[in-house]
Amino acid sequence: MIKVIKKKSHSGLKKRIKISKKKKLLRGHAYKNHLAASKTTKQNRQLRGVTCVKLCDYNRIKTLIRGL
């Protein structure tokens, strides 16, 4: 019998992506870790919270986190 190796989930991506109840992939915004003083208040406010992964990236990310 041939032993099949299980595919592992991408551990770095598992920490950055959450899955909603409707199976949407939620991610945080970029450009908010430092140098926030040079950004406007509106920019910093809009970078808070999470957003959904775009459809063009969805299938690629879904294959990387197959275990979740």
Swiss-Prot record:
Recorded GO MF terms: structural constituent of ribosome
SUPFAM superfamilies, sorted: L35p-like
The UniProt entry's coiled-coil ranges are none
Q: Supply the InterPro entries for this chain.
A: Ribosomal_bL35, Ribosomal_bL35-like, Ribosomal_bL35_CS, Ribosomal_bL35_sf
Alphabetical keyword list: Ribonucleoprotein, Ribosomal protein
Cellular component GO terms, alphabetically?
A: ribonucleoprotein complex; ribosome
Q: One GO biological process from the UniProt record? A: translation
Task: Fetch the Gene3D superfamilies from UniProt.
Answer: 4.10.410.60
Name the family.
Answer: Belongs to the bacterial ribosomal protein bL35 family.
Q: What's the name of the protein? A: Large ribosomal subunit protein bL35
Its source organism is Onion yellows phytoplasma (strain OY-M)
